Amino acid sequence: MSPLDLLDIFEGHTIARRKLRDELQLFMKGERSVEKYREAGISWWDYCGSILINSYPTYFERLPSLIEKINREKRCSKNYVLFLGETGAESNQVPCLSLVQFQIEDDGLVLSAYQRSSDANLGLPADIYHLYLITRQIDLPLKSITLNLGNVHIYENNIDKTCRLLAGEEGVRFDLNV
């Protein structure tokens, strides 16, 4: 996706921008308390109990220092990588996003990511927006974001709503499947 494609998506469609920005900030602070997300108006982690165990905050808390390193070094001969997840680790929500790679090419940022699993209606748009927000913290113009998807699915409880959205209906809201 080009930066203009992303801008069109995020400005032309309804997504929970503020909540997703707040969520990313909490992830990057390493906040594991579900109550803190609730205080920010984010209720989609409630099903995990009171604490997020080996989930996004566990790994995203490494992101600020990685971003600082990228901004300081800006080495085109090096790919900077954030890995999310750990094989066999106990978790109440394994991160769907598994790897984010930052590459500097011709004085611009190329971001590549791998997502192991993705709810097409809720998780995928949220993760794309998070990636976009992350790129804005790097002091380089964005050249592209490439997202490789291992599994994309639509949950049964959202099939009718997906059809309505694809038919052009506006304001369709999707339900979590937990």
List each model region and its residues.
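Terminal, non-catalytic protein-protein interaction segments that mediate quaternary/complex assembly
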Residues: 1-178
